[in-house]
Swiss-Prot record:
This is Agglutinin-like protein 9. Coiled coil: none annotated. It is found in: Cell membrane; Secreted, Cell wall. Residues 1-17 form the signal peptide. The gene is ALS9. It comes from Candida albicans (strain SC5314 / ATCC MYA-2876) (Yeast).
Length: 1890
């Protein structure tokens, strides 16, 4: 037993051990002590001593727990010990084993185990010293090469790891004093291998080695291990002259046990050849190596320098020192770190010691990236032998660039990383240009225009910015005047103008509303004068306190008192008085509490009074009954509760004790029922006579005879001669206990005395009296009581007798000394205690045990066990209590369990009844009680509000019963169109017309006429001009007077600042302007020249220049100007520019034009005039919105949405006396024709004009063209200008139009969405925006079977976001769809369930808006779901369900796969799935069709609709067969097939013997050679008969028993014959199985029904080819026929049978002519599936099949010659199926099915998709494809007829370059994906129709 217990203890200890971390918590020091003759402090030289601090906490560390210290780059431990203990105060708290890394791992480690200690501790800590040496290389092994890079000479950080705890210290390492240019030798002992590792590195050749010889030869006694040789070349050495890499090179080696020689050649410069090997040197004190050192450098130097070195050998005194073999093996384990262990080894038996390197499962880390801010990790574990994978998804940011000007002289770029988003900001600051005066004007265009007027050097440039009118915000204020006042504040462009209207005070009505935001909002609606202003204050909802009062009326009244914000609202509900139930509870507080719970009308109010617990007086009475009775009288609070317990009389046990008083005391203790009462009699102490004897035993004996009170007690002590030490302890009992521990002779006996309160020391003395005396000295508390016992010397023999008296008598007979005294004790008879026990027997047993006097006799009654009744109650404590009441035999035991009250969750539901219902579900303890309240539906009020978000939100607020539900719809604010009118009043009026959501609000502003401000400007003309600009209301009209420029006088001054300043003083017209230039002294050199102009000019020496636009202006107003001002319009162009002194490149990136038709005009007018510095370029383009799809090149796809024309022009002016003009214009109109006109003219100074024009047209290619582009390039060369040498503009527009194809069958989709692109400039700035798509989808599917007709689903998709990433895998076919509403068809037809959210990757569904269930009547139930559901999905599922109804077969057809891995949180149900399809890398589609017909399976579905309520839906399905079909797999796909499991089916596989036969024959003739190969394969099975039976409950009265038996083996024969003349393959086979089903009532006495099914499946396949010359016709025909015969017998003696027959035939014929192969295929398929309902009696079917234009011969099929061609064939199949069914009510039902199929096929790829649609991907030869669809009609006579409707799908493709890539996207892998043209066909349709 003890070994088993120890084994169990060991098992429990091992099984509960855990891994802890953080024990090693400090790296106190790392010091070096020189060993042997090492002369420098290198990391590899012994000995380094590491002092580490450790700490163990008893609360977290248990015996057997383990922890590990990882010591990177540590080679070994310099000690003969194998372990070290972690000790503190002499106690070993843990033992750590040394695991040296040596040549096996790149680190060493300590594997520690917590020891079991006998001392109690909270925390133990200390330090441990470890003598170590580091690994910095030494061989070419992978471990040494890795560790060779651990350290460098100088200061290093050494870090060890204990779990996540890292401890570090710094240390200085000396470099090797040996020169690295000479030869390098090294030898290092590996203790675990008992070998030395020797290294040789050839001396350095700086230019490389031509050839060389290296190696070494051992002396006698030392051997070389040729299996461990490393040869390589290292690119350099580390600071200790060890290789850091090992690369392959050309060499030959010769190795034996006595030497290794390597001959090498052609070593590149910078590399050093090396060789290392293991050397065994046991039992010798030293060994000598002779080194071969011969080499020729590439510079021609040849060195031959062999040498010899003596190494001291390694003497190992371990058990394996006698030459045992050590083998190193590698083993993969499931641990997380690498460890080294030595397997058990007995040197007397074993000859091989094995060192195992335990390596963890290798892990491959794959790093991916995405645009984001956080890094995620996903680990895919692997078993041993596999490789685990860790996918690290790292974020990267994209940038947006903001360019600003600053006062510095250089361009700076600063990147600001966004810590919370994925878009960083790059701020580019460029030097500010010359001083510029900016004039901002408003104009009527919708885009901005900037015109820069550049004055001569040292002047002030002007920038005229024309901005669209700012929106105006009108603010109305009230003042104390009686009239109105209007003030207009005009802000800069892109701002908002303000109009402040001061009106006399209107009365104001303030309305306060509450909303769901956490902040307050105030909106003021100001009406015109004499109106009433409104202030709408939106505040966060106040908390509401509802007070319910009762009044005398018979109806209810509710009064709501809404307080101001930040207050508390009150709802006063006055209700008719409800009846009140008062419940009084007790609680643990010392005060009373009263809680009133007022329920809704017609309810019952509750008053819960919590009172301090009343004291309870329990009175127990005994009565004559044999059972117990308890009566509890609970008094009101502040009273005393009474518990009257009536029990059968308990037996009484009387115990007599002694105490220190001089009188007697009797105490009666009455125990609970079924217990034993106690009577404690306390008597004065009797005198005690103690007789001590010595005997020959080695232990002591004490016998105590206690007499009744007034008697004399006797103690007979038999002791060995040992002394006794008495130890006194305290315990909780009220009496003393003495335990004597007798030790062997020569020991010390111990007496352990347990005393109440004070300890007692008992001293026994001998005296001369003849009687015993006991004296007790009682000391105060915390003292020690003394008992002095004086005993006579003689021993006493006591004899006890029983007598009839009721008291005890003691007679002592004292004999002379050396005699024996006698004590005769007479005792009254002992009381008897009867104990009743239960045992497993069925009868009763009584046993009587008689004890000595003053004892208690026992009667043990054993009874059969009583039954037990368990009662569970709730109480107010927070813990559970269990009380067991055991009654006498033949009674019933009670177990009373008191549990804390369960929490209660109240769920309110609405139902269709007009009254309320409350159901309370009380769960067992530790559960949650539920109260389900069902209320009539509340009326709903819908309120629509506007909010600041860009999307719509619907919030439903469901109020308690008898309330009103609210639906709050939050819509984005409507766009507002503001119309301003003038009127004759002196005040402003604003009228706001607010329309419903998705509309446009109107603001009509009526304003008084504006004042006028006159502004005078200068311009380059010689005459004056006046322009009147009329601004919107509340603005100021402007009159702009343009005057010729005043002459300017320029004054240049020097000042002490480091920057230049230019001040322009502009005088009124006809005056003289002044320019004052203040320049710093350096570094400006000013050269003054005279010229013919009337003004001064300063030209700075500019080394760099950069500007976003170029400008020009007239130098003088007197110069000759072209009278036409057509080209003077100021237009801006956005450019990104860079300059240097030699060239200038300007790259213009035009945004995408979002217009319908436009004209693009570019004009270049280069007039040249003196001075040469007046050069200007004016460019403009309109502004427009654009968004982007990623493009790999700077191109744009133009989208069109309206008919307005926007000109774009670029004009360059060069003023000179000789004029020349060049104009080029490109215009595109809605006719899609491009026109390009080029013209130029020379205009001499004499004003004569010679013009030459040419016109070029560029026509748009046909609509099927894949791509064309038009580029416009203009170029201007600077005129003798050193800082503007050359500027080049290039812009391009690419328009992509591709063909499309449409189908009228299957699926029709119309996508309306905006596609826009973004131009990516050289700074890789990327802007990604999303578009909104509205997709109405209508699908129609016909299966051709009467059980399924049509499904139509119309979904309104309100939000589709198409995402295109910059990098990574791109799938343009995916989208994230959120369906906000769905419309389902009416009852009686199949309901299609559209998923509420679809994603292509992992997605989370929270609070799904709806969940649809289909009942047996095919109705739709919508249940709101408030659970959180997480699903990993690769595809979406659209279940098509039609459940069982009378007279029809039930079938469930999912048309697509269902995702796996779904998890539902919040309900006990789980989601099981059956199929998964994964599509990667392409827009292909994988369709999996699973048709399931199961046998009487019960499917239960759980839906959580708002915790904790639970909705259960049970669907009963009937199925007889399972068929799985997978079709249409296009592109790269991964699919997991469905595995169908049914509990009622037996599992088994066909097994048997396969016998192959093959014969080959060849015959030669003059006509040629004929070869024949005959292959035959036979499969014969021997399947034993096996039967499976499944019994499950059917109804409340019957149960279903299903028995399936398979007993007929399956046989199959395959044969093939191949020859050069013909080939033939045949295959036959058949199988048969039977299924027996029966239903039996639960009492197994009534036979209900039985069904026998027999299934026979014969299959025949024949294939024959013939090869006549020159053409070969090949035909193939395969067929499969399945028959199912089902019969059913019921008690009513009715017979029910079903016959199922299906035929499938396919024929293939080919024609081969020369090397041209054309294919044609003929497909014939007829399927009939006919079943009936449970009530059907008879059934019959007739199938007719005809193939027009073809014969039905299997071996020689023919095709209608009029329809066959080289490109394919066409044929037709007409099938007619007629059925009739007779029901019990003699109602006849007949149906017929007619199907017609016609196919035309090219030798190209055919891809089939769901719903019968097909896609044919042809080359460039063009084709047509037609398919048929079935429509169904139902007549009133219960007949179903299917007729064929022809639908033609045609495609015409004309392209001159079919291989042109239409669009490119970047998938992150560097490849370009070519997308099929159908997608861009949709894009083209979009362009053509918007």
């Amino acid at each position: 037993m003890l070994p088993q217990f120890l084994l169990l203890l060991l098992y429990l200890t091992v099984s509960t051990a855990k891994t802890i971390t953080g024990v090693f918590n400090s790296f106190d020091s790392l010091t070096w002590t020189r060993s042997v003759e090492y002369v420098y402090k290198g990391p590899e030289t012994p000995t380094w001593t590491a002092v580490l601090g450790w700490s163990l906490n008893s609360t977290t560390a248990d015996a057997g727990d383990t922890f590990t210290l990882i010591m990177p780059c540590v080679f070994k431990f310099i000690t003969s010990q194998t372990s070290v203990d972690l000790t503190a105060d002499g106690v070993s708290y843990a033992t750590c084993d040394f695991n040296a890394g040596e040549e096996f791992t790149t680190f060493s480690s300590l594997s520690c185990t917590v020891n079991s200690v006998s001392v109690s501790y909270d925390k133990a800590s200390g330090t441990v010293k470890l003598p170590i040496t580091f690994n910095v290389g030494g061989t070419g092994s992978s471990v040494d090469l890795t560790d060779s890079k651990c350290f460098t000479a100088g200061k290093n950080t050494v870090t060890f790891m204990d779990g996540d705890t890292k401890i570090s210290t710094t240390v200085d390492f000396d470099a090797s004093p040996v020169s690295p240019s000479g030869y390098i030798t090294s030898s290092r002992i590996i203790p675990s291998l008992n070998k030395a590792s020797s290294l040789f590195v050839s001396p350095q050749c700086e230019n490389g080695y031509t050839s060389g010889i290296m190696g070494f030869v051992t002396s006698q006694g030392a051997t070389i291990d040729c299996s461990n040789i490393n040869i390589g070349i290292s690119k350099g050495l580390n600071d200790w002259n060890f290789p850091v890499s090992s690369e392959s090179f050309t060499y030959t080696k010769t190795c034996s046990s006595s030497g290794i020689i390597v001959e090498y050649e052609n070593v590149p410069a910078g590399y050093r050849p090396f060789v290392d090997a293991y050397i065994s040197s046991e039992n010798v004190e030293q060994y000598t190596l002779t080194y071969a050192n011969e080499y020729t450098c590439k510079n021609g130097n040849t060195v031959v320098d062999p040498f010899t070195l003596t190494w001291w050998g390694y003497k190992n005194s371990e058990a394996d020192s006698n030459g045992d073999i050590i083998v190193v093996t590698t083993k993969t384990v499931t641990a997380s770190t690498t460890a080294v262990t030595t397997l058990p080894f007995n040197p007397t038996v074993d000859k091989t010691e094995t060192i195992e390197v335990l390596q963890p499962i290798p892990t491959t880390t794959i790093t991916t990236s995405y645009i984001g801010i956080s890094t995620s990790y996903e680990t895919f574990t692997a078993t041993i032998g596999g490789t685990a994978t860790v996918i690290v998804d790292t974020p990267y940011h994209i940038t947006t660039t903001v360019t600003t000007f600053w006062t510095g002289s250089v361009t700076t770029t600063t990147t600001y990383s966004n810590p919370t988003g994925s878009i960083d900001t790059v701020i580019v600051q460029i030097p500010s240009p010359d001083p510029t005066t900016t004039i901002t004007e408003f104009w009527s265009e919708s885009f901005a225009s900037t015109t820069t007027v550049t004055n001569p050097p040292d002047g002030t440039n002007s920038v005229i910015i024309k901005e669209p009118y700012n929106p105006t915000v009108t603010t109305t204020e009230f003042w104390s005047e009686s009239f109105a006042s209007t003030t207009t504040i005009t802000n800069p462009p892109d701002g908002t103008n303000s109009v402040i209207v001061k009106e006399p005070y209107n009365p104001t009505v303030t309305t306060t509303e509450f909303w769901s935001e956490s902040f307050a909002s105030t909106t003021t609606v100001t009406n015109p004068p004499d109106g009433t202003n409104s202030v709408i204050i939106k505040e966060p909802y106040n908390p509401t306190v509802t007070t319910t009062e009762f009044w005398s009326e018979s109806f209810a009244s509710t009064t709501t008192i809404t307080n101001p914000p930040d207050g508390t609202n009150s709802v006063i509900v006055k209700e008719p008085y409800n009846p009140t139930v008062t419940t009084t509870e007790f609680w643990s507080e010392s005060f009373a509490s009263t809680t009133t719970v007022t329920n809704p009308p017609d309810g019952t109010n509750s008053v819960i009074i919590k009172e301090p617990y009343n004291p309870t007086v329990t009175t127990t009475e005994f009565w004559s009954e044999s059972f117990a009775s308890t009566t509890t009288i609970t008094n009101p609070p502040d009273g005393t509760n009474s518990v009257i317990v009536k029990e059968p009389y308990n037996p009484t046990v009387t115990t007599t004790e002694f105490w220190s008083e001089s009188f007697a005391s009797t105490t009666t203790i009455t125990n609970p029922p079924d217990g034993t009462n106690s009577v404690i009699v306390k008597e004065p102490y009797n005198p005690t006579v103690t007789t001590t004897e010595f005997w020959s035993e080695s232990f002591a004996s004490t016998t105590t005879i206690t007499n009744p009170p007034d008697g004399t007690n006797s103690v007979i002590v038999k002791e060995p001669y040992n002394p006794t030490v008495t130890t006194t302890e305290f315990w909780s009992e009220s009496f003393a206990s003495t335990t004597t521990i007798t030790n062997p002779p020569d020991g010390t006996n111990s007496v352990i005395v347990k005393e109440p309160y004070n300890p007692t020391v008992t001293t026994t003395e001998f005296w001369s009296e003849s009687f015993a005396s006991t004296t007790t000295v009682t000391n105060p508390p915390d003292g020690t009581n003394s008992v002095i016992v004086k005993e006579p010397y003689n021993p006493t023999v006591t004899t006890t007798e029983f007598w009839s008296e009721s008291f005890a008598s003691t007679t002592t007979i004292t004999n002379p000394p050396d005699g024996t005294n006698s004590v005769i004790v007479k005792e009254p008879y002992n009381p008897t205690v009867t104990t009743t026990e239960f045992w497993s027997e069925s009868f009763a047993s009584t046993t009587t045990i008689t004890n000595p006097p003053d004892g208690t006799n026992s009667v043990i009654v054993k009874e059969p066990y009583n039954p037990t009744v368990t009662t569970t109650e709730f109480w107010s404590e927070s813990f559970a209590s269990t009380t067991t009441i055991t009654n006498p035999p033949d009674g019933t035991n009670s177990v009373i369990i008191k549990e804390p009250y369960n929490p209660t969750v109240t769920t309110t539901e609405f139902w269709s009844e007009s009254f309320a219902s409350t159901t309370t579900i009380t769960n067992p303890p530790d559960g949650t009680n539920s109260v389900i309240i069902k209320e009539p539906y509340n009326p709903t009020v819908t309120t629509t509000e506007f909010w600041s978000e860009s999307f719509a939100s619907t919030t439903t607020v469901t109020n308690p019963p008898d309330g009103t539900n609210s639906v709050i719809i939050k819509e984005p604010y409507n766009p507002t169109v503001t119309t301003t009118e003038f009127w004759s009043e002196s005040f402003a009026s604003t009228t706001t017309v607010t329309n419903p959501p998705d509309g446009t609000n109107s603001v009509i502003i009526k304003e008084p006429y504006n004042p006028t401000v006159t502004t005078t400007e200068f311009w380059s003309e010689s005459f004056a001009s006046t322009t009147t600009v009329t601004n919107p209301p509340d603005g100021t009209n402007s009159v702009i007077v343009k005057e010729p420029y005043n002459p300017t006088v320029t004054t240049t001054e020097f000042w002490s600042e480091s920057f230049a300043s230019t001040t322009t003083v502009t005088n009124p017209p006809d005056g003289t302007n002044s320019v004052i230039i203040k320049e710093p002294y350096n570094p400006t050199v000013t050269t003054t020249e005279f010229w013919s102009e009337s003004f001064a000019s300063t030209t700075p020496s500019v080394s760099s220049f950069e500007s976003k636009t170029f400008y020009s202006s007239e130098a003088q107003s007197s110069l000759e100007i072209d009278s036409s001002n057509t080209f003077m319009t100021s237009i801006s162009v956005s450019t990104a520019s860079s300059y240097d002194e030699s060239s200038t490149i300007v790259s213009s990136a035009f945004p995408t034009l979002h217009i319908s038709s436009y004209s693009l005009s570019t004009s270049f007018v280069p007039p040249v005039t003196l001075p040469r510095y007046v050069n200007t370029t004016i460019s403009s383009s309109p502004s427009f919105e654009s968004s982007s799809m990623y493009s790999s090149v700077t191109s744009a796809v133009t989208s069109i949405d309206n008919d307005r024309e926007v000109p774009t022009s670029t004009t360059t002016y060069l003023h000179s006396k000789l004029y020349s003009e060049s104009i080029s214009t490109v215009i595109q109109t809605k006719s899609s024709d491009w026109s390009l006109s080029l013209g130029n003219s020379n205009k001499p100074e004499s004003a004569s004009t010679v013009s030459e024009e040419s016109l070029h047209y560029l026509s748009t290619p046909g609509p099927s063209s894949s791509e064309y582009s038009i580029s416009f390039t203009s170029e201007k060369e600077g005129h003798v200008s050193s800082y503007v040498p050359r500027v080049s503009y290039t812009s391009s527009v690419k328009v992509s139009i591709s063909s499309t194809m449409s189908s009228e069958n299957g699926m029709s989709a119309t996508h309306t969405f905006g596609i826009s692109t973004n131009t990516i400039p050289s700074s890789t700035e990327t802007s990604i925006k999303s578009a909104t798509v509205t997709t109405p989808v209508s699908e129609s599917t016909n299966t051709g079977m009467s059980i399924f007709m049509s499904t139509t689903t119309e979904s309104k998709t309100t939000d589709i976001t198409t995402e295109t990433s910059v990098s990574g895998e791109v799938n343009l076919g995916s989208a994230t769809v959120k369906v906000s509403s769905s419309e389902f068809i009416s009852k009686g037809t199949v309901t299609r369930i559209m998923p509420t959210e679809l994603t292509n990757s992992e997605s989370t569904f929270t609070a799904s808006p709806s969940f649809v269930l289909t009942s047996t009547e095919s109705s739709v139930i919508e249940t709101p779901a408030t659970i959180e559901m997480s699903s990993r999905s690769s595809s979406y599922s659209v279940p098509l369900s039609k459940l069982r109804s009378e007279g029809e077969t039930t079938r469930v057809i999912p048309t697509s796969s269902t995702a796996t891995g779904s998890t539902v949180i919040g309900s006990p149900s789980s989601v099981s799935t059956s199929n998964e399809s994964i599509i990667t890398g392409s827009s292909s589609f994988v369709s999996t069709t699973a048709e399931t017909i199961s046998t009487r399976s019960i499917v239960t579905e759980s839906i959580v609709a708002g915790s904790p309520s639970l909705v259960l839906t049970t669907t009963v399905l009937d199925t007889t067969e399972t068929t799985i079909t997978e079709t249409s797999i296009v592109g790269e796909s991964s699919s997991r097939s469905l595995t169908f499991k049914a509990s009622s089916l037996s599992k088994g596989e066909i097994t048997g013997t396969v016998t192959p036969e093959m014969s080959v024959s060849t015959s030669k003739a003059t006509t040629g050679t004929t070869s024949e190969v005959s292959i035959k394969e036979s499969l014969t099975t021997k399947v034993p008969t096996f039967t499976s039976t499944t019994i499950k409950p059917e109804t409340s009265e019957t149960q279903h028993s299903e028995s399936r038996t398979t007993q007929i083996p399956y046989s199959e024969t395959k044969g093939s014959q191949l020859s050069t003349a013909n080939s033939q393959v045949s295959q036959t086979g058949s199988s048969k199985s039977s299924i027996f089903e029966s239903a039996i009532s639960k009492d197994e006495s009534t036979f209900v029904s039985a069904t026998v099914k027999s299934i026979t499946t014969p299959a025949v396949t024949q294939y024959q080819t013939s090869l006549p010359n020159p053409a070969v016709s090949v035909s193939e025909e395969s067929g499969k026929k399945s028959s199912i015969i089902e019969s059913q017998t019921e008690n009513s003696a009715t017979q029910h049978s079903i016959y199922f027959d299906s035929i499938e035939t396919s024929t293939l014929s080919n024609t081969l002519a020369n090397t041209l192969v054309s294919g044609a295929m003929k497909n014939s398929e007829t399927t009939s599936e006919l079943t009936t309902s449970d009530k059907a009696i008879g059934f019959s079917t007739t199938t007719e099949t005809s193939i027009p234009g073809a014969t039905n011969s299997a071996l020689s099929p023919s095709v209608d010659s009029g329809k066959s061609s080289m490109l394919g064939w066409s044929g037709g199949i007409v099938s007619t199926v007629s059925t009739s069914t007779r029901l019990e009510d003699s109602t006849a039902t007949s149906s017929s099915i007619t199907a017609a199929n016609q196919d035309s096929l090219n030798p190209s790829t055919v891809s089939k998709y769901p719903h019968g649609s097909e896609t044919i991907d042809n080359g460039s030869n063009g084709s047509s494809h037609s398919s048929s669809a079935l429509a169904s009609t139902i007549s009133a006579s219960h007949s179903i007829k299917f007729s064929a409707h022809q639908t033609t799908l045609s495609q015409s493709l004309i392209s001159s370059s079919t291989k042109t890539v239409i669009a490119s996207t970047y998938d992150g892998s560097g490849s370009v994906i070519k997308l099929h043209s159908w997608f861009y066909g949709l894009v083209t349709i979009f362009f053509l129709f918007i």
